[in-house]
Amino acid sequence: ADEAAAAKPAAPADNAPVPLKHGKGTVLIVDDEDDLRRVAQMILKRCGYECVECDNGQDAIKIYQSLYRTGTPPDVVLMDLTLRGGMNGTETASEILALDRDARIVCTSGSVTQEVQMVFLERGFVGVLPKPYEAGELTQTVHRVATAMRRSA
């Protein structure tokens, strides 16, 4: 009986990795952790996305402004709450939303409770991606936000 049980394929575990989701579009990655930015960029590029990245709010606003003025704003902004320089992620997101109220900003943070998520959504973020995240969670979130943006455009 044990041999028969062993021959059956295992049911997918609840903690099985989320599959990667391929797509198109531009993603602005704003995070003070250099390694995390590099890994996120590598994963997203492999899945078909173009990426621009920086580690502080001032650069994020400049990059967004520049792309917005050329008519090609990022499809998704991944915004960490802790950034280098003087501005945090919430302040940076507010500045970007003042420039483009249709900006699609996803909060990435390691300290996100249900209440905190609600505050971010009220402030104009379109989603929250808790850290640490898996490659599949990253690509699924980016795909969902990028395609939702294109539908409303």
State where each predicted segment sits.
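Disordered, acidic interdomain junction associated with two-component signaling
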Residues: 1-28, 65-69, 119
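Short hydrophobic/Thr-rich beta-strand motif most characteristic of the beta2 strand and flanking loop
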Residues: 48-63, 129, 141
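Conserved sequence signature across two-component system core domains
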Residues: 30-33, 54, 77, 108
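The C-terminal output helix
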Residues: 2-9, 143-153
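Alpha4 helix (beta4-alpha4-beta5 surface) of REC/receiver domains from two-component response regulators
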Residues: 87-99, 104-130, 136, 140
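Active-site residues of response regulator receiver
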Residues: 80-82
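Charged docking surfaces used in two-component/phosphorelay signaling
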Residues: 38-46
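Hydrophobic residue at a beta-alpha junction
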Residues: 55, 84-87
